């Protein structure tokens, strides 16, 4: 196609393509201007992670992992180079705090922390020489937020001052057990906080490992023992308690664990036998008084009450015998009498109550004795609706006169009050009590006879 000279000039002047030139400096300057426009058209390279559509290659054609690496300085010392850097300063707030590198090196090498051919200090060296706040270019956050191992443990020391439990929770979640235990061993306040926290959340496994590391044998044993509370099956709980017998408890605690194991073992036997008797309907006590609950996992006193209620007359050789339980678990006389009295009085078995307090001396004489005091006996009998004759018998056995009169008046044991006033020769008190009994009753007649007697020398 033939073109005139004017057409050619118009083509070259209007085309976006530049004519070829042998002037290296002019060509380099045009490259630098193109580079500046390309940089200005991009977003701030600190936020370049969102620009997934951009081709991540360097200007030399080398693929890189970040756009921040793709910014390359060109060789040259023209004024336009300084102008490009000034615009970059405006776009990156941290740029002013970095040392200015010589123009013979690229920014990509700077951010990678290594040099191009030649000598250039690394990124860590450059940052160490900078007194101002430093940044992590990849994250755009101050490096001071990232702490090393020793600084992390300076946080745990604040627990002593500020009681910041969240620090301990964070360390528990992020550190291995060995490191956590070793560091807490020299921080007793933080250690106590962690132990309390583990107990609250029920992390028995970590708590046992901690006590084992600290060589706290008794606390280790107690923590292991507490796990039986989470076992519902009686047989499995019994087997678990058996494993606790040999743990390094104190002598007193070891005896308690042994007793608990023995008690549960007996409860399992008693429960199986009584369930069979109750379902068969052949035993009168179970027909009249059906069981309201299972005996399994009940305390010792409850088990004794159960035995006194359902198995009171059994021989000592059986596991369910109250006497057997008393001897096996060394139950004191006071506790045994109090429990047996409550059980037999509830059944209104007054003969058993009488036999419970009757003792014989070596000459064969009988005497009533109550380790709990007869005033307690009277209160329990009245609570279980004992007849007045039974109440009067035991009120008379109270030794203290004032207590006897108060109990007799409270529970309307008229004969006891009248006889006591007569023995005290207290005419005024007897007259006052006469107004409290029914008119025309036998008690009123008895009081009149005593008041009219000439053989009594009244003190008032």
UniProtKB/Swiss-Prot annotation:
Q: Which InterPro entries match?
A: Spe-39 (IPR040057)
Superkingdom to which the source organism belongs: Eukaryota
For this UniProt record, the keywords arranged alphabetically read as follows: Cytoplasm, Cytoplasmic vesicle, Differentiation, Endosome, Phosphoprotein, Protein transport, Spermatogenesis, Transcription, Transcription regulation, Transport
Residues bearing Phosphothreonine are: 21, 115, 130
Q: Which GO terms describe its cellular component?
A: cytoplasm; early endosome; endosome; Golgi apparatus; late endosome; recycling endosome; vesicle tethering complex
Q: Where is the composition biased (Polar residues)?
A: 121-133
Summary of the function given for this chain in its UniProt record: Proposed to be involved in endosomal maturation implicating in part VPS33B. In epithelial cells, the VPS33B:VIPAS39 complex may play a role in the apical RAB11A-dependent recycling pathway and in the maintenance of the apical-basolateral polarity. May play a role in lysosomal trafficking, probably via association with the core HOPS complex in a discrete population of endosomes; the functions seems to be independent of VPS33B. May play a role in vesicular trafficking during spermatogenesis. May be involved in direct or indirect transcriptional regulation of E-cadherin.
PANTHER family referenced in this protein's UniProt entry, alphabetically: DEFECTIVE SPERMATOGENESIS PROTEIN 39, SPERMATOGENESIS-DEFECTIVE PROTEIN 39 HOMOLOG
- Would you identify the family this protein belongs to, as annotated? Belongs to the SPE39 family.
Oligomeric form and interacting partners: Interacts with VPS33B. Associates with the homotypic fusion and vacuole protein sorting (HOPS) complex; impaired by VPS33B. Interacts with RAB11A.
What is the name of this protein? Spermatogenesis-defective protein 39 homolog
Biological source species: Rattus norvegicus (Rat)
From the broadest rank down, the organism's phylogenetic lineage runs: Eukaryota, Metazoa, Chordata, Craniata, Vertebrata
This chain is encoded by the gene named Vipas39
């Amino acid at each position: 196609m033939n073109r005139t000279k004017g057409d050619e000039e118009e083509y070259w002047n209007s085309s976006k393509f530049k004519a070829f030139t042998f002037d290296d400096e002019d060509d380099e300057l045009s490259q630098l201007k193109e580079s500046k426009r390309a940089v200005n058209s991009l977003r701030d390279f600190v936020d370049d992670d969102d620009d997934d559509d951009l081709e991540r290659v360097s200007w030399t054609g080398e693929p890189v992992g970040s756009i921040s690496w793709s910014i390359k300085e060109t060789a040259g010392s023209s004024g336009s180079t300084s102008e490009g850097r000034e615009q970059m300063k405006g776009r990156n707030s941290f740029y002013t705090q970095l040392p200015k590198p010589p123009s013979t090196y690229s920014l990509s090498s700077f951010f990678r922390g290594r040099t191009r051919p030649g000598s250039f200090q690394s990124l860590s060296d450059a940052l160490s020489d900078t007194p101002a706040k430093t940044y992590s270019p990849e994250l755009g956050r101050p490096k001071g937020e990232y702490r090393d191992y020793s600084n992390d443990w300076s946080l745990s020391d604040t627990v002593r001052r500020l009681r910041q439990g969240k620090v301990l929770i964070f360390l528990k979640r992020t550190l291995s057990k060995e490191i956590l235990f070793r560091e807490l061993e020299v921080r007793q306040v933080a250690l106590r906080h962690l132990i309390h926290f583990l107990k609250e959340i029920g992390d028995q496994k970590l708590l046992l490992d901690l006590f084992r590391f600290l060589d706290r044998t008794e606390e280790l044993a107690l923590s292991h023992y507490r796990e039986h509370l989470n076992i519902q099956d009686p047989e499995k709980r019994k087997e678990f308690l058996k494993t606790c017998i040999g743990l390094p408890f104190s002598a007193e605690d070891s005896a308690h664990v042994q007793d608990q194991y023995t008690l549960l073992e007996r409860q399992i036997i008693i429960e199986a036998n009584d369930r069979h008797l109750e379902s068969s309907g052949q035993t009168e006590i179970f027909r009249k008084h059906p069981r309201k609950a299972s005996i399994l996992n009940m305390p010792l006193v409850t088990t004794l009450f159960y035995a006194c209620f359902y198995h009171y007359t059994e021989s000592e050789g059986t596991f369910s015998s109250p006497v057997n339980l008393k001897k096996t678990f060394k139950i004191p006389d006071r506790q045994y009498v109090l429990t047996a009295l409550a059980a037999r009085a509830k059944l209104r078995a007054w003969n058993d109550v009488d036999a419970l307090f009757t003792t014989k001396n070596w000459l064969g004489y009988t005497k009533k004795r109550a380790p709990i005091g007869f005033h307690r006996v009277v209160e329990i009998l009245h609570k279980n609706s004992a007849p007045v004759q039974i109440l009067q018998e035991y009120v008379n056995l109270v030794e203290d006169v004032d207590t006897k009169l108060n109990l007799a008046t409270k529970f309307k044991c008229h004969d006891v009050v009248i006889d006591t006033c007569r023995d005290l020769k207290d005419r005024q008190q007897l007259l006052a009590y006469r107004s409290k009994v029914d008119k025309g009753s036998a008690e009123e007649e008895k009081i009149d006879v005593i008041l009219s007697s000439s053989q009594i020398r009244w003190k008032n």
